[in-house]
């Protein structure tokens, strides 16, 4: 067998575009030094990356870095879907970042560069064909986030959140790398397909205690990335301490990366006899604990964080069924895989819409505030309140949020087809439990108990020349750092809402892509 690797630069085009975006952002910040130009370069780079992924993915599966039949980078339908999602979510987060960057507490060049660098890891992650490529891509996605979380000047909460996130992520990465090393020691393979074939051909490998330890370490390390219970404690603290756009990125792109990595190893590499029961148990714990703790939350972002934990449980459930269905029909396994991918797509779109609405309801650069501050918000900013309500109703799985409804139906159906009726019942019970806190927030938006604690609209710039010359009066809100200007956030919120409605009325679009 030849040890010379083949290289297909077309397969690498989306990754090239993402990495090139990061370089161009640095050059724009250095040479032009205008925030608008830097942000525009990052946004155009994200669009180019998405377009490149569609172009390459539409031409069939492409493999590169191959030695014999084993390839380290495989760009096909799933990789294209992941790359497009990562690029468009990055574009959406850039749209939400305008008020944060205008507030002046966060350097624009560094912020956009870190987002582009993280996007590069996400684009490469979906195409990873071996454990090392997968881990490196996942860390390329995650490493810039440590800095992004703590990049806001003068914020102790951001620094604490960054340290928490860093420590937990380093431990998770260490466990994953150790598990990969032990797997190599027991099997002599790192490529995902080769690992799966070895475990199928040589079942005696499963009797080696070191194999069980290795698989457990890899699974634990990756479940930390999706904030699965009991490895979830970092998520609420990190989300609440991070700037709102960064919290949105953590809740969407970072979560997507963890799910993609976990799905890759469960579907192709790790033995179902070990991973199936572990993932099913983690799914039950994650969705139950996430929903129960979310009921007690009084801060907006913490509620969304715990909701994200619960949603991770719904995603893990079909992954557990996928492994448990190893001895069942190929259709059952395919349904479980498609359900996990489809649910993740529905979730990240709705989550982006929810964070966009919260950004629209908060002062520039502020945190998410408390639920009490959302009371009566529909009277002042009805478009943002409607967007938040639709997103939360969708996450709850109720009409008109049909995306969330079909996501949960898809998960339950895949569990039933895979013979995991008990797990399907737990999902159904938790879906009902989640209604309580989602609908509580929706009701608060239209509450008349007290006016919403929301500053004045920043677009209402004083027209009095004297007022403009002397600046804002004492106790008033400076328009440059008050509520977000409606346009960029409204575009992101409207786009996310429209996408959620489209896939809600035509879920087969996502299911067909997920099944590729």
UniProtKB/Swiss-Prot annotation:
Membrane as UniProt keyword: yes
Reaction catalysed by this enzyme: a quinone + NADH + 5 H(+)(in) = a quinol + NAD(+) + 4 H(+)(out)
Entry EC no(s): 7.1.1.-
A GO MF term: NADH dehydrogenase (ubiquinone) activity
Residues passing through the membrane, by range: 12-32, 37-57, 81-101, 108-128, 131-151, 163-183, 213-233, 246-266, 274-294, 303-323, 341-361, 386-406, 419-439, 491-511
Pfam family, one: Proton_antipo_M
Keyword field contains ATP-binding: no
UniProt entry keywords in alphabetical sequence: Cell membrane, Membrane, NAD, Quinone, Translocase, Transmembrane, Transmembrane helix, Transport
UniProt record, GO biological process: ATP synthesis coupled electron transport
Main location: membrane
Superkingdom, taxonomy of origin: Bacteria
Subcellular location(s) of the protein: Cell membrane
One cellular component (GO) term of this entry: plasma membrane
Membrane topology of the entry: Multi-pass membrane protein
Family: Belongs to the complex I subunit 2 family.
Function, in words: NDH-1 shuttles electrons from NADH, via FMN and iron-sulfur (Fe-S) centers, to quinones in the respiratory chain. The immediate electron acceptor for the enzyme in this species is believed to be a menaquinone. Couples the redox reaction to proton translocation (for every two electrons transferred, four hydrogen ions are translocated across the cytoplasmic membrane), and thus conserves the redox energy in a proton gradient.
Summary of subunit composition and partner proteins: NDH-1 is composed of 14 different subunits. Subunits NuoA, H, J, K, L, M, N constitute the membrane sector of the complex.
Protein's UniProt name: NADH-quinone oxidoreductase subunit N
Gene name in the database record: nuoN
């Amino acid at each position: 067998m030849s040890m010379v690797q083949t290289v297909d630069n077309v397969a690498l085009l989306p990754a090239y575009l993402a990495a090139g975006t990061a370089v161009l952002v640095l050059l724009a910040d250095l040479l032009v030094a205008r925030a608008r130009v830097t942000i525009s370069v990052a946004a155009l780079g994200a669009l180019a990356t998405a377009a490149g992924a569609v172009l390459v993915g539409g031409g069939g599966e492409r493999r590169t870095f191959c030695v014999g039949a084993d390839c380290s980078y495989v760009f096909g339908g799933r990789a294209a879907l992941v790359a497009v999602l990562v690029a468009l979510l990055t574009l959406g987060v850039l749209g939400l970042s305008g008020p944060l960057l205008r507030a002046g507490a966060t350097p624009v060049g560094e912020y956009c560069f870190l987002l582009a660098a993280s996007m590069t890891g996400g684009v490469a992650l979906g195409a990873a064909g071996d454990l090392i490529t997968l881990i490196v891509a996942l860390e390329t996605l995650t490493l810039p986030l440590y800095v992004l979380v703590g990049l806001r000047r003068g914020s102790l909460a951001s620094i604490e959140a960054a340290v928490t996130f860093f420590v937990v992520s380093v431990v998770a990465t260490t466990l994953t790398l150790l598990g990969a090393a032990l797997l190599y020691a027991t099997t002599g393979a790192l490529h995902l397909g080769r690992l799966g074939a070895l475990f199928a051909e040589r079942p005696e490998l499963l009797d080696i205690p070191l194999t069980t330890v290795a698989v457990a370490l890899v699974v634990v390390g990756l479940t930390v990335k999706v904030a699965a219970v009991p490895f979830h404690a970092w998520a609420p603290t990190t989300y609440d301490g991070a700037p709102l756009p960064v919290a949105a990125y953590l809740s969407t792109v970072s979560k997507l990366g963890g799910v993609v990595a976990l799905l890759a190893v469960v579907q192709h590499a790790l033995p179902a006899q070990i991973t199936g029961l572990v993932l099913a148990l983690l799914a039950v714990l994650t969705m139950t604990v996430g929903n129960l703790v979310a009921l007690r939350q009084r801060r907006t972002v913490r509620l969304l964080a715990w909701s994200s934990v619960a949603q991770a449980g719904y995603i893990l459930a079909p992954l557990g069924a996928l492994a448990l269905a190893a001895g069942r029909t190929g259709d059952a396994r395919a349904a479980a895989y498609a359900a996990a991918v489809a649910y993740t797509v529905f979730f990240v779109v709705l989550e982006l819409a929810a964070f966009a609405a919260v950004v629209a309801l908060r002062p520039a650069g502020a945190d998410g505030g408390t639920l009490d501050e959302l009371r009566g918000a529909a009277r002042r900013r009805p478009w943002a309140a409607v967007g938040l309500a639709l997103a939360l109703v969708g996450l709850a799985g109720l009409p008109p949020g049909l995306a969330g409804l079909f996501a949960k139906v898809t998960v339950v159906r895949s569990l039933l087809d895979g013979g995991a009726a008990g797990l399907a019942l737990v999902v159904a019970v938790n879906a009902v439990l989640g209604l309580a806190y989602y609908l509580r927030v929706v009701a608060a938006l239209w509450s008349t108990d007290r006016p919403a604690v929301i500053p004045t609209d920043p677009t209402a710039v004083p027209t009095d020349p004297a007022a403009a010359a002397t600046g804002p009066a004492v106790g008033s809100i400076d328009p440059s750092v008050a509520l977000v200007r409606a346009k960029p956030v409204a575009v992101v919120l409207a786009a996310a809402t429209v996408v959620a409605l489209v896939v809600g009325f035509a879920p087969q679009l996502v299911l067909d892509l997920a099944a590729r």
